[in-house]
Amino acid sequence: MAMQKIFAREILDSRGNPTVEVDLHTAKGRFRAAVPSGASTGIYEALELRDGDKSRYLGKGVLKAVEHINKTLGPALLEKKLSVVDQEKVDKFMIELDGTENKSKFGANAILGVSLAVCKAGAAEKGVPLYRHIADLAGNPDLVLPVPAFNVINGGSHAGNKLAMQEFMILPVGASSFREAMRIGAEVYHHLKGVIKGKYGKDATNVGDEGGFAPNILENNEALELLKTAIQAAGYPDKVVIGMDVAASEFYRNGKYDLDFKSPDDPSRHITGEKLGELYKSFIKNYPVVSIEDPFDQDDWKTWTSFLSGVNIQIVGDDLTVTNLKRIAQAVEKKACNCLLLKVNQIGSVTESIQACKLAQSNGWGVMVSHRSGETEDTFIADLVVGLCTGQIKTGAPCRSERLAKYNQLMRIEEALGDKAVFAGRKFRNPKAK
């Protein structure tokens, strides 16, 4: 079924920054998609086009990207008369029209907005739910509900505290369903609020960009201690494990790492990658840490590789791999990590996101689908994670509507699947393993 109209506009994301929203019309109706945006971005990500006009939104406007859709991409697609069910053809056409390696002509935010809307329209055209359409595009007969990784303590570039490491997450792997995982996550979150309030006072329970708490602590193991206490208090020590996103590229300084990077610079406190690796090993030993994302800088390949060989937990590449096929292939070859963080806006199209996921999975990696810190009410990634059967998703704390939008959609999907619903649980790293 052909597209009848494509219209883009500038809307605001959860941080009050502009982003792109696309409305695509077919005979079946109107399909709307909005594009997310990250705070700690990898240098190898596809280009997010911003206007740079300091008199509007401090330079962060996206009118250029919107205009590229309304004046160029949209009309070209309508003229081409491609069907919305041909996701790959549509994406390929836009990528070739852009003609750059990193989508810098039109902006990944322009191409992705259209790509997401086309995917939603394609599902409607086939008369199937979005998650089923995505599963078909990926060649998956199965559907899997993911374990949610709730980011409940925020540090790094997401928070105004001194904590260097960006995210401390809880994963309710012992739950029997996604709905139960939500309940467990929410209960631990509320207990954590009480623990933080009791220890640091009420103002320490203010939340960061992703709904997690941002108490003013400096020591990273103090955050882990808070999680451990909250998990015990909620009564789930056997059901909840811990994940971290260190986002180490944010505090990499001249070949070393600064765990107090928000204070005035002092090179004498910088530590080597090897020393940082030892710190992670102590975390794994003393706490139920099962997953660490971006433990080292995006170009510190050597440290990634030596660290991976010495641990048996999940090591996730985000800034390292940026959902990019070339970077993933490089990481596979160097044995740098064993899990891909999948962010649709890092690569900028649905087709390439599916390809990245399949490349990672075919090499025995896990895949974790992820939001960005600047989000919208769009729930596309909830359907994406089910269709791609990755078994794990991180989309913030059980707090803030732009985060809950995704989690609530996952509960609806589980409900719709009824007794066919499969929850990844403890098999979150490889949910397809029989």
UniProtKB/Swiss-Prot annotation:
Using the record's annotations, give every residue carrying the modification Phosphothreonine. Answer: T72, T205, T229
Keyword GTP-binding on this protein? no
Q: Where does substrate bind?
A: H158, E167, E293, D318, S370, H371, R372, S373, K394
> What InterPro entries does the database record attribute to this sequence?
Enolase (IPR000941), Enolase-like_C_sf (IPR036849), Enolase-like_N (IPR029017), Enolase_C (IPR020810), Enolase_CS (IPR020809), Enolase_N (IPR020811)
User: At what positions is Phosphotyrosine found?
Assistant: Y236
* Catalytic reaction equation(s): (2R)-2-phosphoglycerate = phosphoenolpyruvate + H2O
Q: Give the protein's cofactors.
A: Mg(2+)
Q: Pathway of this protein?
A: Carbohydrate degradation; glycolysis; pyruvate from D-glyceraldehyde 3-phosphate: step 4/5
- Cofactor stoichiometry and binding remark: Mg(2+) is required for catalysis and for stabilizing the dimer.
Spell out the GO cellular component terms annotated for this protein, sorted alphabetically and separated by semicolons: phosphopyruvate hydratase complex
Q: Which GO terms describe its molecular function?
A: magnesium ion binding; phosphopyruvate hydratase activity
Q: Which Pfam families match?
A: Enolase_C (PF00113), Enolase_N (PF03952)
Annotated positions of the Phosphoserine modification: S83, S157, S176, S263
Active-site positions on this chain: E210, K343
Among the GO biological process terms of this entry, one is: glycolytic process
Under the subunit heading, UniProt states:
Mammalian enolase is composed of 3 isozyme subunits, alpha, beta and gamma, which can form homodimers or heterodimers which are cell-type and development-specific. Interacts with PNKD.
NCBIfam families in the record:
eno
Q: Which family does the entry's similarity section mention? A: Belongs to the enolase family.
Name of this protein: Beta-enolase
What species does this protein belong to? Answer: Sus scrofa
Name of the gene this protein is made from: ENO3
